[in-house]
Amino acid sequence: NYLYSERHHIELKERLKCVLHRTLRKDVSEYIKYTNREAMTVAFNPTPAEEELYREVSAYIQDVSKIAVTTRYRTLIVLMIRKLMSSSTAAVKGTLEKLMERLCRIEKLGGNTGDLIVFDEDLLEEYQDSLSDFDDRCRNAYAKNYPTDADLKAEKEFLQSLIDKAGKIEVDGKTEKLVGAINRGFEKIREKGGLRKVIIFTESNRTLNYLFDYLSAHGFKDKIITFNGQNNSPLCNRIYNDFVENHSAELTGSRANDMKKALVAAFREEAEIMIATEAAAEGLNLQFCSLLVNYDLPWNPQRIEQRIGRIHRYKQKCDVVIINFINKQNLADVRLYDILQY
């Protein structure tokens, strides 16, 4: 294979070096003075109720006899659900409700599951490209094994029990540590001369909304804006309309670009907190902010670096502080944390 041959790698580098030059940050440090970066870790343990829910949902999605999780592309769907489980109970509950909707549709259509796969706007944005590659094929997939009425009834009852358990968990274990972590971060950046601003990254839109409500009720009401792939909330639309009215000379004619400008301006001039999904990990210049919270850790370390690059960049005047939430009982989180130490 050309891509994995060492000889071809060397040949390709020789062919490209006359037109392609890679400059690392360390290569220009003599000319451009980048600020320092300080990392903080917030370790947390899920509550017993969260642990029980995680075990039961894990067993459910791994059971190949279950109807709601499609047989085709099961591995990818299970992967995404696992990531949502590590994000928040709110994300888990919403996903379980989507699975229940799927069972009800299967029941209504008499067992034909051909065009029914769990497509949900809350699927992790980092997997959207992978999903689009087989979207059409999934929608045209045909399941030959029709579930019985008894199977559907039993699975719906079990799924409802999981939804009920999720609904009883009002605040997650790691959420209880969020306000304290933000305030410690604010104190750190105050000492470094930074502004009282923080961007919080999550991988789930439902977690974004859950955190917005939680922080609004715990001292940050009217101090928060959100940024995701849609930016169609009433708050985003209000900010956009205000920006259009007061900054007409800066408009580009593209609603998506102007919305991005409006949200960045609102964060810079008014808000203390921006809660964002991976949609904000590229293309935003937030050098006026020097505090970042990784509420969810992507499994790809490069994505973490892309997030940090929103604030730790050229024209950043202060040292930056990065707060990483680590689930000490999640082996993937622990391993990723170990990787980030090097």
Where are the language model's segments positioned?
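A short beta-strand element within the Helicase C-terminal
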Residues: 285-296, 321-324
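Secondary-structure transition/capping motifs at alpha-helix termini
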Residues: 218-222, 299, 314-318
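SF2 helicase motor core recognition
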Residues: 264, 275-289, 309-313
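A conserved SF2-helicase RecA2
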Residues: 302-308, 313-342
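Conserved nucleotide-binding/hydrolysis micro-motifs of P-loop NTPases
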Residues: 47-51, 84-85, 91-92, 99, ...
